[in-house]
């Protein structure tokens, strides 16, 4: 098996995650899909790391994880406060950008 | 496994592992997207993440594999579940699309994007894999540490600052300053008396032989459920179960069953 | 002595500032302050004049540098004055006649509650006019030029409560702007051509400049002169300017300001001498105007407007003379001075008549006034004799010289110009005799005014008659004084130069012809107005009369050509603007609006919709990258 397959898998997972972001309305699920996309990227980085024979890809993946953790913390806090004020976790309900 | 082999191909064991676990990961991802309940989505995502952790390990990223399990699956996904519980675990989403054409556009874009991405990877024609044998010679964790604390030290420090900011931000977002003193039990009861309603304690939730839960409203004398009997949090989530008609339908079902049985005995007698 | 020059201007300027800023507390004495300061300026003028007479002709010109006004690189404008014989003549005329008219106004404006302001404006005018004639460069002259324009505007519209006065002031101002534009452009051309606009350097470098440029400058200066001096084609404002108080008409619109154009042409003689084409145009303008004004003057029943036509005509004479070059410069100025005396006297006389007749201006409602106001009659009569050129009086000397000079121009032009001037003299005799007869002779024709007040003609107060008497003396003797031994010619010659020319006809012939025409003109007038009673309501009259009553259709001409033309131009521009420009603009806006209305639908507020477009964009980017790699 060629390790390139890991990259194909990453691409597939990323696309599934992105599509999920587009079609789900529940903010928490949307958020999970974003996490899925980030994980797909991490997989690609790890595969790249193996491909190039150095650890830089793993470092980037590590940083991605840290940033993802920070993002989850803030994002979930936003969802909680949104839910508190609007009693809903639907991203469409927050369509206040439209007049 | 020789280093030469690692450059071009992997062991059969890894190939087998990839095809089995890869399928699991894709199914998990699809379930994450298409499950109606957020809890199920979260569990499926956790499964996918564990599969990814295994892949990390297979790719020589031992540290990341462990971190993936401990931090991602263990901490972050649990945070997700925690929030799901907070927001309402039973609130199933309707998957019906509300924005016209959104689903089609999303599918077209997703398909196009995926095909293009995969075509791009195929187009890149990556042949040689160097393998991490040399890089991991002193141990994966040591190698990572050497990079993080030398080459990437500034990024690392800035990431630390980002984490602190995120923690403070989350607290600021969710924290609500109490502007007035919480009322004591005594004050609450005095207020109730002054306002003249609900002078006695609030009614208890419905207690039935077959249901005994806080999410079932107690029935008023005329048979309608009283929302007062259910906790405020559940009321706000809309998670009150209405069982007021269940008793009647149960009775109807009972009568029907009894009739069926009686008829059968009647017919049995008749045949005798 | 040089330092006194600035004082000439400073005195009336101080008066203007004090009177205009002093407020009501000066109401009681304001007119005397104004008169005293004008007289101060006159006394300074006399002192300077005496000083000048004591010097040789070559050393008479003096100058005073006050301060550097706009020093910007090569653009050096100074406030400095030059007092030579030409300026001196004007200074004496302006301050002398000005002081007399100040004195006259004390009586004339006695019942006007804004008299202080009136005197402030008069002083402002004096200051500006003196600045105009004393400036030693064109830019400073321009300041004075605009200053007198402003004073003229303020004084014509002094009775601003009358819509006609306000309109007349506006008209004078606007028409003058056209001429001022000529002067300002002339100054600009001068600066680009000569690098300076001071009189001396400009005139010195005339010889080194092409004739075309000089002709252009000359024509622009002529345009300026036409505006200020009411020459054809910018003459239409002068008749309406008679809406102003009579002393204003006498001072500004007869004796001084309207002659500024003549001063400009004579002062710029060096330029005109080198540009014969411009000179020819000047003479043509002068000849046309002198006939034009005379014809208008024949038809007007309003005494002041008849005199205004006469002013126009007389200035036409001066411009004609000024256009003749060195043959005529001296006589232009000489006629200017004598005209200043007798026309101011005539206007003051007219003012005196109006003063006695409840401000009635229609001569058809006068008649037989000689017994009621004898002083006015005598002074007016002397002015009349002077203007028609009765032998021995001022007009005789100065006008005769101009006619002679016109013939001396030589060639066909000389005959045409001389003929026009002779004809003008005959018409002058006609219309002035008409004014004289209709006002002072014949039977009484006055009627009660609309409020039923029967006019009681009476002689004017002393403060009004004294200036009239003084001016009458001037009208009688000035011409003779100037002509004895050609004293005026010798006086001005160092500045303007002089040449006799070679007249095809002798001076005696011209004089005799003038006399004959004078008698003919006066005789016709007598036959028409003296022998027969004058109808109170004007008869319909011939086509020419009717046209002349309407100022020979000058306003109609302006209306049709300029106003209508402007309106049509504006309308067509508005049409183009509405259809083409607005069409393009509105069309663009509408199409943008429509497009936006459709694009707006994309902006539905749903974050997921936006995410789709982002995602699609990312897909397109990948496609583009792949395509680029493939290519």
Swiss-Prot record, chain A:
The keyword Membrane applies. GO terms for cellular component: NADH dehydrogenase complex; plasma membrane. It is a multi-pass membrane protein. GO terms for biological process: ATP synthesis coupled electron transport. HAMAP family: NDH1_NuoK. NDH-1 is composed of 14 different subunits. Subunits NuoA, H, J, K, L, M, N constitute the membrane sector of the complex. It is found in: Cell membrane. One of its GO terms (molecular function) is NADH:ubiquinone reductase (non-electrogenic) activity. Belongs to the complex I subunit 4L family. It catalyses: a quinone + NADH + 5 H(+)(in) = a quinol + NAD(+) + 4 H(+)(out). Its main location: membrane. NDH-1 shuttles electrons from NADH, via FMN and iron-sulfur (Fe-S) centers, to quinones in the respiratory chain. The immediate electron acceptor for the enzyme in this species is believed to be a menaquinone. Couples the redox reaction to proton translocation (for every two electrons transferred, four hydrogen ions are translocated across the cytoplasmic membrane), and thus conserves the redox energy in a proton gradient. The chain crosses the membrane at residues 3-23, 28-48, 59-79. Its EC number is 7.1.1.-. Keywords: Cell membrane, Membrane, NAD, Quinone, Translocase, Transmembrane, Transmembrane helix, Transport. This is NADH-quinone oxidoreductase subunit K 2.
């Amino acid at each position: 098996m060629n390790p390139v397959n890991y990259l194909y898998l990453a691409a597939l997972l990323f696309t599934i995650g992105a599509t999920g972001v587009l079609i789900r309305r529940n903010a928490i699920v949307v958020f999970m899909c974003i996490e899925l996309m980030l994980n797909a990227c991490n997989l690609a980085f790890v595969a790249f790391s193996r491909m190039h024979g150095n650890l830089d890809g793993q470092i980037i993946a590590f940083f991605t994880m840290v940033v993802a953790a920070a993002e989850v913390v803030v994002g979930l806090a936003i969802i909680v406060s949104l839910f508190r004020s609007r009693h809903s976790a639907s991203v469409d309900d927050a369509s206040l950008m439209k007049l | 496994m020789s280093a030469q082999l690692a450059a071009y191909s992997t062991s059969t064991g890894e190939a087998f592992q990839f095809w089995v676990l890869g399928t699991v990961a894709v199914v998990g991802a699809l379930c994450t997207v298409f499950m109606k309940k957020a809890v199920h989505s979260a569990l499926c995502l956790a499964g996918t993440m564990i599969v990814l952790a295994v892949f990390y390990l297979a790719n020589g990223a031992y540290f990341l594999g462990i971190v993936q399990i401990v931090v991602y699956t263990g901490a972050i996904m649990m945070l997700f579940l925690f929030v799901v519980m907070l927001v309402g675990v039973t609130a199933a989403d309707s998957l019906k699309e509300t924005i016209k054409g959104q689903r089609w556009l999303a599918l077209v874009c997703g398909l196009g994007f995926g095909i293009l991405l995969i075509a791009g990877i195929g187009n890149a024609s990556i042949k040689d894999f160097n393998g991490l044998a040399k890089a991991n010679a002193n141990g994966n964790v040591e190698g990572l540490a050497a990079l993080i604390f030398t080459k990437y030290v500034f990024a690392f420090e800035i990431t630390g600052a980002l984490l602190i900011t995120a923690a403070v931000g989350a607290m600021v977002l969710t924290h609500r300053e109490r502007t007035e003193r919480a009322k004591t039990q005594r004050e609450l009861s005095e207020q109730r008396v002054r306002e003249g309603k609900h002078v006695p304690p609030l009614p208890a939730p419905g207690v039935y032989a077959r249901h005994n839960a806080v999410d079932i409203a107690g029935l008023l004398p005329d048979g309608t459920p009283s929302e007062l009997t259910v906790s405020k949090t559940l009321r706000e989530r809309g998670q009150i179960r209405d069982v007021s008609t269940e008793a009647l339908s149960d009775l109807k079902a009972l009568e029907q069953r009894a009739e069926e049985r009686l008829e059968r005995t009647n017919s049995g007698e008749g045949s005798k | 002595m040089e330092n006194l020059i600035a004082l000439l201007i400073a005195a009336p300027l101080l008066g203007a500032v004090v009177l205009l800023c002093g407020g009501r507390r000066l109401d009681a004495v304001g007119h005397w302050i104004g008169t005293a300061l004008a007289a101060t300026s006159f006394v300074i003028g006399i002192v300077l004049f005496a000083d000048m007479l004591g010097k040789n002709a070559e050393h008479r010109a003096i100058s005073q540098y006050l301060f550097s006004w706009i020093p910007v690189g090569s653009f050096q404008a100074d406030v400095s004055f030059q007092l030579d014989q030409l300026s001196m003549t004007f200074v004496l005329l302006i301050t002398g006649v000005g002081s007399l008219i100040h004195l006259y106004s004390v009586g004339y404006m006695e019942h006007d509650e804004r008299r202080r302001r009136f005197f402030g404006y008069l002083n402002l005018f004096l200051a500006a006019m003196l600045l105009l004639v004393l400036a030693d460069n064109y830019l400073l002259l321009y300041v004075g030029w605009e200053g007198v324009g402003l004073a003229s505007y303020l004084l014509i519209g002094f009775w601003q409560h009358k819509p006609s006065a306000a309109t007349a002031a506006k008209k004078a101002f606007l028409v003058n702007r056209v001429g001022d534009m000529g002067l300002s452009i002339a100054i600009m051309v001068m600066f680009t051509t000569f690098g300076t606009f001071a009189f001396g350097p400009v005139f010195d470098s005339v010889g080194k400049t092409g004739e075309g440029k000089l002709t252009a400058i000359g024509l622009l200066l002529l345009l300026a002169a036409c505006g200020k001096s009411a020459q054809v084609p910018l003459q239409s404002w002068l008749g309406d300017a008679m809406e102003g108080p009579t002393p204003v008409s006498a001072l500004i619109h007869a004796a001084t300001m309207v002659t500024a154009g003549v001063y400009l042409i004579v002062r710029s003689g060096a330029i005109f001498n080198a540009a014969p084409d411009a000179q020819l145009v000047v003479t043509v303008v002068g000849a046309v105007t002198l006939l034009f004004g005379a014809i208008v003057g024949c038809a007007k029943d309003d005494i002041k407007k008849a005199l205004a036509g006469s002013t126009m005509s007389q200035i036409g004479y001066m411009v004609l003379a000024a256009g003749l070059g060195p043959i005529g410069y001296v006589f232009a100025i000489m006629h200017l001075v004598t005209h200043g005396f007798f026309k101011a006297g005539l206007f003051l006389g007219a003012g005196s008549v109006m003063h006695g007749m409840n401000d009635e201006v229609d001569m058809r409602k006068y008649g037989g006034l000689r017994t009621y106001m004898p002083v006015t009659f005598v002074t007016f009569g002397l002015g009349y004799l002077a203007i028609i050129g009765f032998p021995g009086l001022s007009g005789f000397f100065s006008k005769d010289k101009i006619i002679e000079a016109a013939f001396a121009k030589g060639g066909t032009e000389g005959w045409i110009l001389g003929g026009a001037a002779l004809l003008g003299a005959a018409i002058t005799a006609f219309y002035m005799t008409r004014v004289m007869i209709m006002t002072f002779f014949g039977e009484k024709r006055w009627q009660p005014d609309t409020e039923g007040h029967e006019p009681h003609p009476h002689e004017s107060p002393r403060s009004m008659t004294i200036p009239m008497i003084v001016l009458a003396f001037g009208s009688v003797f000035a011409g003779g004084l100037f002509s004895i031994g050609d004293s005026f010619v010798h006086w001005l010659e160092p500045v303007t130069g002089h040449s006799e020319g070679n007249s095809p006809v002798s001076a005696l012939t011209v004089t005799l012809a003038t006399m004959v025409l004078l008698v003919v003109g006066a005789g016709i007038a007598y036959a028409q107005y003296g022998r027969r009673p004058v109808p109170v309501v004007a008869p319909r009259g011939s086509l020419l009369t009717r046209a002349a009553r309407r100022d020979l259709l000058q306003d109609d001409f302006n209306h049709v050509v300029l106003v209508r033309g402007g309106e049509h131009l504006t309308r067509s521009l508005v049409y183009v603007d509405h259809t083409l420009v607005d069409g393009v603009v509105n069309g663009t806006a509408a199409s943008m609006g429509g497009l936006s209305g459709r694009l707006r639908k994309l902006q539905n507020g749903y974050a997921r919709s936006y995410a789709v477009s982002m995602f699609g964009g990312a897909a397109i980017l990948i496609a583009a990258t792949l395509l680029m790699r493939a290519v």
